[in-house]
Swiss-Prot record:
This is Putrescine/agmatine-binding protein. Binds putrescine and agmatine. One of its GO terms (cellular component) is extracellular space. It comes from Pseudomonas aeruginosa (strain ATCC 15692 / DSM 22644 / CIP 104116 / JCM 14847 / LMG 12228 / 1C / PRS 101 / PAO1). Belongs to the bacterial solute-binding protein 1 family. GO terms for biological process: polyamine transport. Keywords: Periplasm, Signal, Transport. It is found in: Periplasm. GO terms for molecular function: polyamine binding. Residues 1-19 form the signal peptide. PANTHER family: NORSPERMIDINE SENSOR (PTHR30222:SF12), SPERMIDINE/PUTRESCINE-BINDING PERIPLASMIC PROTEIN (PTHR30222). The keyword Signal applies. It comes from the Bacteria. It holds the Pfam family SBP_bac_8.
Amino acid sequence: MKKVCALALSILTTIGATAADSAWAAQTSVHLYNWYDFIAPETPKAFQKETGTRVVLDTFDSAETAQGKLMVGRSGYDVVVITSNILPGLIKAGVLQELDRDRLPHWKNLDADILGKLQANDPGNRYAVPYLWGTTGIAYDVDKVRKLLGPDAPVDSWDLVFKEENISRLSQCGVATLDSSTELVSIALNYLGLPHNSQNPEDYQKAQELLLKVRPYIRYFDSSRVDTDLSNGNVCVVVGWQGTAYMAQVNNEQAGNGRHIAYSIPREGSLVWAENMVLLKDAPHPQQGYALIDYLLRPEVIARTSNYVGYPNGNQAALPLVERKLRENPAVYLSKETMATLFPLETLPLKVERIRTRVWSRVKTGS
């Protein structure tokens, strides 16, 4: 009888160990959903080397795409990098897991001012961890723009792309823009002297008229290839993020093609935005998710990503590790005067979001 019990115990122990091993094997990956080309390439491999956990990376090129996928649920992702204005909707829908800061020892490195601003969309900083932040402006090929518009080209103004006499001439060398209703419609409203977060349908009609007037001169709407096309000369003006210009500059340096790419935040004002790491409530691997978020909070780790993509981060301890050419670039680490001209992305009522989406659809199709 003892032999039978011993045998049974041995079998059960073996089964238990096998089950535990299988469970651990299933837990040795973490799924990250991030913007296209928005993390230093060596970071996932470095994390795996240190922890044994493989990072499975999926990417998106618009906040609207990511939001739609997350709202459906069961995405299979653990950690997602998401724009601040989308946070309230995800929190309300119960998509996100409230963070246990005891599992994030490197939280202490975060900038208190950045955390304070984030509370507008995440009260108490309960769900989101600052990752990178940036602006939307105009990236352009200095020589090509001057050749077409002269030395006094209004590169410090939205007039460059919203006045037909300018954009019609620039279309000869190519004008492209982000594919983002949230950003472009808000910028158009602000340019017209209207509230960027307007809830008045008539204001959106005016923004639509402005955008449709310049639509024939826009070559394409795409958020993922504008930096490459700017650096190789396929386009000369891009309404895009500051990192668009930075990546184009890096590509030019590597290619040695002599192109001079610059970035401008128009004097009329533009968007400032923040990207944040969140842990999904239905994350398949929450333990590994916490480990990845905390790893990305290390100063040396997030500094590598800033140096790669050209965006500032919300990690105060990382600032000395950010390359000098970024730290001292006034288009990256902004002056108080420039910051005062910027406005944030905001969550709007669903009926207004639908109006904005319809406007953008009409602009893209030119109808």
